[in-house]
Amino acid sequence: MKWITRERVKVDRVACPWLIKKFIDPDAEFLSVPAAQVMAVAERENAIPYDVKDVELGHHGKECSFDAVVKKYNLDRDPAMNLLAKIVNGADTDNSLWNQPEAAGLNTVAEGFRHLGLKNDHQINAAQWIVSDALYAYCQEMIRGDKLDGSFR
């Protein structure tokens, strides 16, 4: 399946493809185009849009696109995924929904990846997905240790 978003990835547009590839669609193909072209290219390519305005898998209220993907694909039954969603949400928004302390660190690391001189969004995603793997492992460990809100609470 094809998935599409706007170019120049940030936290949510890195976390969503990681989530999709790892838990929903292992054969996913990701497209990133200028924001004004997303819907036209999505229609032409039969691609699912995410993290763009006015789409199902976008921001809704204080929830980010990662939240929308987690809910739509029923990944919210996993407590570690719920903790990860709180962290991603806080990193991608003003962090007022959950006030998750780990969010600032994720935002900082994600912003750093944008300044490594990587050529395009695909390279940024490929490089940064190890961070998502590590963060999900952290969330799993927090849940095993009965720290449902992370280690900083």
Predicted regions located by residue number:
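A charged, amphipathic interaction segment
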Residues: K71-R153
